A protein has these predicted regions:
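Short, solvent-exposed turn/loop segments enriched in Gly/Ser/Thr/Pro and often Arg
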Residues: 1, 33-40
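Well-ordered alpha-helical segments within folded domains of soluble proteins
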Residues: 1-8, 75-84, 128-130
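Conserved small/polar residues in nucleotide/adenosyl-binding loops
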Residues: 2-10, 162-169
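Catalytic-core region of carbohydrate-active enzymes that cleave or remodel glycosidic bonds
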Residues: 5-35
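Generic alpha-helical structural context detector
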Residues: 21, 25-29, 40, 80-83, ...
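Short, surface-exposed recognition loops and adjoining beta-strand edges that mediate ligand/DNA contacts
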Residues: 23, 37-50
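Catalytic cores of secreted or luminal carbohydrate-active enzymes
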Residues: 44-119, 124-125
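Beta-rich accessory regions
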Residues: 91-165
Length: 169
């Protein structure tokens, strides 16, 4: 079981998944360059190059991402995190599939002895629309629980062109 399972067991209202999302977008993926060749080895959250040079407390902070070096621990940890991302995106318990993070992905699982596949399409966090398509060879009754982010103030759910009210837990 992944960290997402631990968090979901503690609280199903999405608070822990909000923290996972913030860490993912603001700490983890921001630490690597788009081409995957340079890294921030510390995450100062904000870098002002002139201030870094003048302030002795920031001597360990590099104002630009650095290339790989001999004793690198961050790049392998980033790779490990990204390859285990599925454990954070989805969790299951009983007949409920939880979607903790909104990331374009496919998830195949078994619920009540029936195989289902969720196809999630999104450009989140840059766009707020998330599309979920459920695929199953046979009728499969299950609950699909998705997180309403703590910052979200106006959400709509549409199933087969019908607007629905979501249940909050």
């Amino acid at each position: 079981r992944g960290l997402g399972d631990v968090y979901k067991r503690q609280d199903t209202n999405g608070v822990y998944a909000d923290v996972m999302e913030k860490a993912l977008y603001n700490g983890i993926i921001s630490g690597i360059s788009l081409d995957g060749t340079k890294f921030f080895y510390v995450n100062p959250l904000a870098v002002k190059p002139k201030a870094v040079k003048k302030d002795q407390r920031l001597i360990h902070v590099e104002p630009r991402r650095q290339k790989w070096f001999a004793c690198a621990c961050c790049p392998p940890n980033l790779a490990r995190m990204m390859t285990s991302l599925g454990e954070y995106i989805y969790t299951t318990e009983g007949n409920t599939v939880y979607q903790n993070l909104f990331i374009g992905s496919d998830m195949k699982t078994e619920v009540n002895g029936k195989e289902i596949t969720l196809h999630v399409t999104t450009s989140y966090p840059w766009e707020e629309t998330v599309s979920v398509r459920v695929e199953s060879m046979e009728d499969a009754a299950f609950e699909y629980a998705f997180r309403v982010p703590g910052w979200c103030r106006g959400m709509t759910v549409t199933v087969s062109y019908t607007h629905l009210r979501a249940h909050e837990t």
